[in-house]
């Protein structure tokens, strides 16, 4: 059995000069990079591609190259749906994990812009702990 996905067109019928926005959620950890496009409310997913879907080796999932390839796939799918502009929400692991995004974050954003998508707002949505669980490491911290 083959599943056939129907393509909904969200672009305007008036012309190509109007901007039709979507939201791209880029989650860049040090193990993988997710590029996920939704509508403005965040309810409907148009496309979701990870770095692991683009490369074979586990060590390359979070690489800038894998993030760039994932972003190019996302742009192709967005253009099918009629989306020509994106608001960007970038996220690192956060919480008790690291608050700096992984190596694929910058590469994914650059690939989106170079592929012809208009970039609206860029926002950092990394979760910040407000008195959370105990962090990894001893009482004296991680000793190098």
UniProtKB/Swiss-Prot annotation:
InterPro entries: Ribosomal_uS11 (IPR001971), Ribosomal_uS11_CS (IPR018102), Ribosomal_uS11_sf (IPR036967)
Family stated for the protein in its record: Belongs to the universal ribosomal protein uS11 family.
One GO process term, biological-process aspect: translation
tRNA processing in keyword set: no
Species whose genome carries this gene: Trypanosoma brucei brucei
Stretches with biased composition (Basic residues): 135-144
UniProt name for this protein: Small ribosomal subunit protein uS11
GO molecular function term, any single one: structural constituent of ribosome
